Amino acid sequence: MGIFDKFNIEVYNQLVERTKINGEASNMKKKLITALLATSVMSTMFSGCSVSTSTGSTATTDTSTKTESKTTDEATGEEVEITWLFWDDLEATEDLITIGYKQVIDRFNEEYKGKYHVKAITTNLAEYPAKLNALVAAGDVPDVFTCDPGPMLTQYVEAGATADLTDILQNQESEWYGTFSDGIFERLTYDGKIMAVPTCFAAACVFYNTEIFKEVGVEVPETYDQLIDVCKKIKEAGYAPISCSAGTAWCLGMIGGYLCDREGGPDNLKGINDGTLDWTSETFINAGKKLKELSQYFQESAAGDANDIATAHFYNGEAAMLVQGSWAIGQINGSNPAFEEKCGVFRFPGIEGGADPNRMIVKTDNLCMSSKTEHPEACIALMKMFTDDTSEKYIAEVGGKIPVTNVEFDVNKAPKQLSFIQDILSKTTGTLGFYNESLINTEAGDTFNNACVDIFLGTATPEEAFQKIQDHYDKKVRNK
């Protein structure tokens, strides 16, 4: 089952309108934009594996318990414990967003001491989907868990693992619901039912080292051809032009997705999803050829580097550019605070003769509540704290991501990179999700990401790699 959800960049503009700079509203020029965000639903399950936690094993919930029911512990006045599953280590991290989430957990446990207590279960991002899937398959769904929009969320909605939050938000907690930016629940709604709560919003851009650019004597590229020219000059100067993780396939897939969109725009995704366009079409082959050309300017260790390592190459000054989401700001500034002053941001370049170059890859981070939790009141209290003014101000002023509520924050306190991203978004004409998250299901998305890796490694030509995706669609998508 595939759907196209509308995402309105007016959400972002409303947020900026409420932002305060030294007590005054931002005078940034804003453009109202409505864009089609192609997402996909339905997915296959990942292979299961055992759970690694930071505080012990997960608490098993009674899968027959309804979300709306009161709990025995609450009825007797005893402190109840809930679990929250997250994709980073709350104790060892330097990522500023994760540090902020840890503060939420600590604040929650202190404020609700004697009534509620949340136990965080953590893993790394690469293992997170499989571990969450294993818990869902075992009937041990955490009371609250973090989830991406698109196929990842859809699979848990269709499995009945996530609670319908519509009545809670629109009726029981209408004041809380009213704090969110208009339209922010679009990608989290299924058949009119809200299945998750967003915590922050981010956009994928190109981060660059301004000192290296100045040293080499290059300007920010606006087109793909200019980007290649910049890469050549930076490589000649002895730096890695771009740091990228091919070891984390979605990172390479994000670049591949941008190239596909810059070649054919929203028509590419629409055509693939409605069956009127094949992956072997010239628009995709051209994108694959550009991915291969661009990849020769990645760091030498790109094939094996995980995402965190690739990001470290950038903020340690070894690479001049990093294609990543604004979620990376927290990691960059948290790991190397001094780097903030030399970190610029620009939009992924357009292709001359191609499609609209002003479209952006965007996403939200989200919280889901288990449909079988025995403690819905505690879960909602936690989700509310994740999105209260204290948390949302931290998201912007420290973490550099965009709040999902109408909170007013001081841009002067926020990381410099956030203002650059605000400027880019103010000129954005449309949005899309990650390419792999915009296809029919997770298996199709994985096939796309793996094709991008094959092109980079040279194990397949662009024609061969995209033929593999087409073969997958012919056998498992369109031949059903």
Predicted regions and their residues:
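Conserved N-terminal structural module of periplasmic/extracytoplasmic solute-binding proteins
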Residues: 4, 12, 20, 34-35, ...
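A structural signal for short loop-to-beta-strand junctions that line the ligand-binding cleft
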Residues: 135, 142-143, 173-212, 240-244, ...
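Extracytoplasmic/periplasmic substrate-recognition and gating elements
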Residues: 80, 107-114, 215-216, 289, ...
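C-terminal capping/gating helix-and-loop segments adjacent to ligand/active sites or protein-protein/ligand interfaces
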Residues: 189, 361, 401-407, 420-474
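Short, solvent-exposed loop/beta-turn-alpha elements that line the ligand-binding surface or hinge
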Residues: 166-180, 263-286, 334-338, 350-358, ...
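Hinge/lid segment of periplasmic solute-binding proteins
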Residues: 124, 148-205, 219, 228, ...
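Glycine-centered hinge/linker elements that transmit conformational signals in sensory
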Residues: 231-233, 273-303
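Extracytoplasmic/periplasmic solute-binding protein
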Residues: 190-199, 204, 228-276, 319
